[in-house]
Structures are given as structure tokens and as C-alpha cells.
UniProtKB/Swiss-Prot annotation:
GO molecular function: metal ion binding; serine-type endopeptidase activity; tripeptidyl-peptidase activity
Residue sites binding Ca(2+) per the record: D538, I539, G570, D572
Source organism of this protein record: Trichophyton verrucosum (strain HKI 0517)
CDD domains, sorted: Peptidases_S53 (cd04056), Pro-peptidase_S53 (cd11377)
Gene name of this polypeptide: SED3
Designated name of the protein: Probable tripeptidyl-peptidase SED3
Amino acid sequence: MLLRWHSVIPLFLTMTVALPNTYRTVVEDLPAIPEGWVQGNPPSPETSVRMNLAVGQRNTRTFEQIVLDISTPGHRNYGKHLSRRDLKGLLRPRRETSNLILSWLEESGVPKRSIVDDGDWIHFVISISQAERMLQTRFYYFHDVQDPGISMIRTLKYSVPSRLARHVYMIQPTTKFGKPKKHANSVASLQVIYSSTNATENCNATITPRCLRELYKMGDYVAKPDCRNVIGISGYLDQYARYSDFYKFLELYAPEMKGANFSVAHIGNGQNLQNSTRNSIEASLDIEYALGLSNASAVFYTTSGRGPLVPDLDQPEQEHNSNEPYLDQLHYLLSLPQEALPAVLSTSYGENEQSVPERFSHATCNLFAQLGARGVSVIFSSGDSGVGSSCLTNGKKKITRFNPTFPASCPFVTSVGATFKINPERAIGFSSGGFSDRHSRPVYQNDAVQHYLDKLGDQWKGLYNPKGRGIPDVSAQGANFAIYDHGKVITVSGTSASAPAFAAIIANLNAIRLRANKPVLGYLNPFIYGKGREGFTDIVHGGSKGCVGYSSTNGSTPAVPYASWNATEGWDPVTGVGTPNFRILAKIVQHME
């Protein structure tokens, strides 16, 4: 059903290469150097690199079903979240598989002390010369054509012994090109609308915490802080959460939350510089609304680096990589003991699904599922490109296509679209949605999505995958949020605003459950499409836009006249099942078993 790591095996994985005394299977083979890069000299043979090896899983179906069972209200296992030890035991490969890989690493010269066997993942440090022998490849520096100062060590092809081919799912960094770009266009980028020192309380013009409280029927509810109810905020791309701005925001817009605070967890040398002059709009928005509405304990997870990128027109490699380092953050979180995990994780970043290597996207989605198994509600903004921006596939055959987004397309995250206006709320044009080309439609979504497709008929046929996971799941206000950043009030828009607002509501629902001696909600989607459905207000006005024939980063692109996903009765691919009604949801979750 979901996360079929071995359900689609690329042709190159079946190719074997005859070498002296052995056979090898090519894992990845790029046909050419990616556009925007030039090959330079080989690195020093002594240069060290940290590799991450994803082990092929044997219990995928069992694991998926367990996650669904413990996340479906009414099931006998509902709320029985797994400990780290239980999860690792479930996912740990057969001993012979681990031994086979570990023996290969040691035989290849990988220092035993550098190998970390984490069951379904194995991490190790190796020199370039050893890596070249082990993977039967050559590494080179590759330089950015437009910015020669940016370079990275990569290869175009690597292989493993054929006896290991079904055990080694992925090794990186190898063929994954990409580079850091500061504040690039991500699918959940924020749009600064205007600056003001006196933001209006007119909720049709400016959104504040008070507006959201009234709109989503939260009233004056303020939860008591609970160490079991931590809300985590993801910080990428050199975004820093500034304490001075946060305190001033609470003073102006959420005085009832006076005394709220957040801590910082540094992942992979991530920083949270308080005196930086860099734009910090995303971090300010996320932390101010997550805590301005929830009063939960909060952790800002600041992560350095970037993830791998498969270039497309919206994110061509030479300038526009904004992929985030999900793996670093996920491995860190999953290493934590149960009491240190956040109950809710809100992330306001993403990219076009096709820009992420397919195996990388499946491996990452599996890790999101692991967080869900441990009781974490993983929430992502759906994106800000409507039905798509470039609307063109990035394969050898360039085909006009609506572009779904990732990680919103992962079935084990809850994706949040955007609305605007009140009385009634309306779908906003930039709210990303659609259907995944990588992940099949999960069973909990079948009825809701099929109902929409039946009404859609043949419209947009061939431009999307009708069997794919539908995006988003829910929605919330996403336009003209007042925030305090670098000493001033500004308003911003994007599904980046919708995600932390929705996450705060989930944190408040968790507080109600904990007070009733019940477990936190955990992975949300089976609840949202099931018993929780009546707690959402259906959005039936407005729609998304896109495919206008122009990409903000690459100029002329295919145009699809009147391309849109319309908000309609029931689930739709712009607002999901609708916006939350806290009053109704609170009654549902208080007694839910």
C-alpha cells in the first residue's frame, strides 16, 4: 500500500557489471553531469566523507499496518505508540543482512570504529580512495558554473557487489547534486506584503492570534505547559528564531501567553544567531504562532546543510536549491528517548516532489512514518505554487504536468493548505495541492479522494496521477499574518503560516487528552479522515491557480489555460477536508479511544 521501497525498481538496478572475480550491480548512473556544474580535479585521496547507507527493509508491510493501527481511533491498538527499542526491533534487518553489509564495509577498508549500525541505517566515515574502491567509481570536485566558489565532491555512477544489491537501498552522498542557496524560492516561501507598526485587528485584512482563536472556536483556552506535550519547530536555511522578537510579539498579540518560551536544539552544527542581520521571517512566523496559540513547551530544531536535489525548472541546481536536510533532523529525532520527543513537529518547508531523488523521498517518508509510530504528529505546509509553477517534468521527455510537492506528498505527514478571508473562508490561489506521482493513495483517503475525482471527471486528465496520495489533508488561514521580526511588525503569507497555526491547535488537543489520562494524538491522518472529520469546516469557495506559462526562476514554461483545483464540497486538493473547529475537535478527542 504505502512506502513500497522495492515496488518500483529502476532499470539500472537490474544491470550487472562483470568485473574480475565478482559481479556488481549499478545502483545509480547519471547519464551526464547535471546542468550548471562542471567537473574539476579529483579530491585528495585522504579526504574523508560521511556516508549514509539505507538498508532494504523486510517488514515494510507489517510496519505500515502497525502505524495505521495505532493511529486509527477504535482499533484495539489505538494510542499504543512504540518505544524506540520496540521500533528498532521491528525494523532491524535480518542479522545475516547486517553482517553481510558490515563485512563488506570492513573488507573495503572502512574503519570499524567509524561504523554506526543503527539497524535500518548504517552510517560510516571513509576516505575518498577507499570509497572509490568500494563503490567502483571515481569522485571529483564539481564546480558551479555561475559561482565557481561553490563546489562539492560527487560521482556520476556507483555500484555494489551483486550479492548486496537487494540489501543496499541507497548510499549517499554520491550522485546527489545540489548546493546551499540562501533564502531561495521554496514551495512554502513567504511573501512579505507590507510593513507596519500598527497592524489592524480587522481579520479580513490582517491575521493575528486573536483572529485565529475566534475563527477556529478556540476562545480563551490556554493549556497548562506539560513536558509530555512539546511542539517542535523545524528551522532550516539559516533561519534563526530571535528571542527579542518573540517576546515582543507575545506582548503585542498574545499577552495571555506571557511567560511562554522555547529552547533550541542544534543539529549538525545548526545555529540560532541572535544578532544576525539575515532575514528570519520564517523562523519568527513559526515560533510566534506555534506558541502564541498553544502555550506548549517548544523546541526550535535548527539544522544546517541542504538535502540532495534533482533539478527541475522551479529549482534548477545552479542557483535555486532549497531542499532541506530532512535526514539529519529525522535521524536526530528518532535517536531521542520517548520522553524527549516532541508530540507535534511543524515544518514549513518543501520542494517539488520530482526534484527529490525517488529513493531519497521513499526513505525519508519511511522515517516520518517512524516518528508517527512513536506518537509524533508530523505536520508540513503543502506549498505555495498552486497546481504547479513550472508544470514540466524533469525527465528525458519533458511533459506538461501538475507538480505535486514533497514532503507534503508523503502519506505519513499531515499536509496543510491555505485559506484566506472570513465569513466565508476561501481557498487561496497559491495553496499547493494535487496528487503524488511517487506515493499511492492511502486507504484512509480512498473514499474522500475518490468522491472528488468522480466529480472532476476527465478535467485535467493526463496532467496528474489519479491514483496518487491526495494533497493537502487540511487547511488553515495563510494570508497576511502579522509577525514581529527584526524589531518591526510585518505581514506575511504562505502555507508556511498555515502549518504552525494548525500545529498549535493539535498541541492544544493533546493537552486535553493528557489531562484526561489519554495518549497524545500521534499520526493524525486516519483520525482526520475518520472520527475527526466532523471537526473540520468544509471550504467550498475559491481555488488554486498555476501553470501560467512562467516560472519565477526559469522564465517561459508550459501554460495550461485556467489550471486550477477548485474548493468544493468534501475533500479537495486545495483545502483538504477543511479548517479546524477546535470546540468540536476537543469534544471528540476528550473521550476518543
